[in-house]
């Protein structure tokens, strides 16, 4: 038998659960008549280096030297500016307003456009400096070694641009990529086989402002991370491919320290990088813990 309920109208339901009528207030509703608290001048004791918003999710367009060459992905943004000691606060709504303007102009996110964005942000916010950071998944085609079947892999990319009206720009590029590592000790002491696992390589590269950037920094950082591990990861592997990848890992055993140092050597040879930090983490297959190594280096 159908159960019938006798429900009151929706406004009455809302009132029953606590909703009340709007209060007719006395404060102004016109923007020009409202008190502007954050722009109230006074001595607020300290300058602030960075203030703004973070974790702003927004669709972005990126270019890639690996297929797919043009991609729409999701960027997680952070926008900050400096704040002088005589200003109480910033106009935070202007931060996401500017993002929307760039989006409506169909911008492609790269270091050129991020530099424009950071400089515009400082001007719009009437501050001497501004920073913009964005992280996003970057997809690229990976072809299996023997059967030549293709699939999409991804790595996480991070880009930061900071602008100061007197000091100019500073930029960092980063990647988090995955690869296979096979333990040299396990290979050496075992009659057969060796334990292997997935390794996570995180790179942060500080960009040399005097050098020419590569066409696609993402691909260069990916190569530095992947080619110094035991073997690459693949989305599609048939048996001939799996045989080749397994043997390749056995032919190139790597401790976490080895991956770290070999990756550092590649980054050292890249003229567009002035300094870097690397972290390598192995999700150990025969332990419950991870193996980790970190390194930082400045060419200056």
Swiss-Prot record:
EC main group: hydrolase
Reaction catalysed by this enzyme: GTP + H2O = 7,8-dihydroneopterin 3'-triphosphate + formate + H(+)
Residue ranges that the Swiss-Prot or TrEMBL entry lists as coiled coil: none
UniProtKB keywords: Hydrolase
Site note May be catalytically important, residues: 183
EC number: 3.5.4.16
InterPro entries, per database record: GTP_cyclohydrolase_FolE2, GTP_cyclohydrolase_FolE2/MptA
Biological processes annotated in GO: tetrahydrofolate biosynthetic process
One of the Pfam families matching this protein, by short name: GCHY-1
One Gene Ontology term of the molecular function aspect: GTP cyclohydrolase I activity
Pathway the protein contributes to: Cofactor biosynthesis; 7,8-dihydroneopterin triphosphate biosynthesis; 7,8-dihydroneopterin triphosphate from GTP: step 1/1
Family indicated by similarity: Belongs to the GTP cyclohydrolase IV family.
Function field: Converts GTP to 7,8-dihydroneopterin triphosphate.
Name of protein: GTP cyclohydrolase FolE2
Organism: Bacillus licheniformis (strain ATCC 14580 / DSM 13 / JCM 2505 / CCUG 7422 / NBRC 12200 / NCIMB 9375 / NCTC 10341 / NRRL NRS-1264 / Gibson 46)
């Amino acid at each position: 038998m159908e159960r019938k309920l006798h429900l009151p109208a929706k406004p009455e339901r809302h009132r029953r659960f606590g909703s009340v009528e709007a209060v007719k207030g006395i404060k102004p509703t016109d923007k020009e008549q409202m008190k502007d608290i954050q722009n109230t001048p006074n001595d607020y004791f300290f300058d602030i280096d960075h203030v703004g918003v973070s974790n702003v999710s927004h669709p972005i367009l990126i270019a890639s030297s690996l297929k797919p060459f043009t991609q729409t992905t999701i960027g997680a943004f952070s926008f900050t500016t400096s704040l002088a000691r005589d200003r109480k606060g910033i106009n935070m709504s202007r931060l996401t307003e500017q993002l929307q303007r760039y989006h409506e102009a169909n911008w492609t996110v790269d270091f050129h456009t991020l530099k424009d964005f950071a400089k515009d942000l400082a001007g719009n916010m009437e501050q001497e400096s501004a920073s913009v950071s964005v992280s996003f998944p970057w997809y690229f085609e990976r072809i299996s070694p023997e059967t030549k079947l293709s699939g999409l892999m991804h790595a996480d990319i991070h880009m930061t641009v900071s602008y100061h009206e007197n000091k100019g720009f500073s930029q960092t590029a980063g990647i988090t990529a995955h690869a296979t590592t096979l333990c040299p000790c396990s290979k050496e002491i075992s009659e057969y086989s060796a334990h292997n696992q997935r390794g996570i390589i995180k790179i942060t590269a500080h960009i040399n402002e005097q050098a020419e950037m590569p066409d696609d920094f993402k691909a260069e950082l990916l190569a530095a991370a992947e080619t110094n591990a035991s073997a690459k990861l693949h989305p599609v592997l048939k048996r001939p491919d799996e045989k080749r990848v397994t043997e390749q890992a056995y032919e190139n055993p790597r401790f976490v320290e080895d991956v770290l140092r070999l990756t550092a050597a590649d980054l050292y040879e890249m003229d567009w990088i002035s300094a870097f930090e690397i972290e390598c983490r192995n999700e150990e297959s025969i332990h419950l813990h991870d193996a980790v190594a970190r390194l930082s280096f400045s060419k200056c």
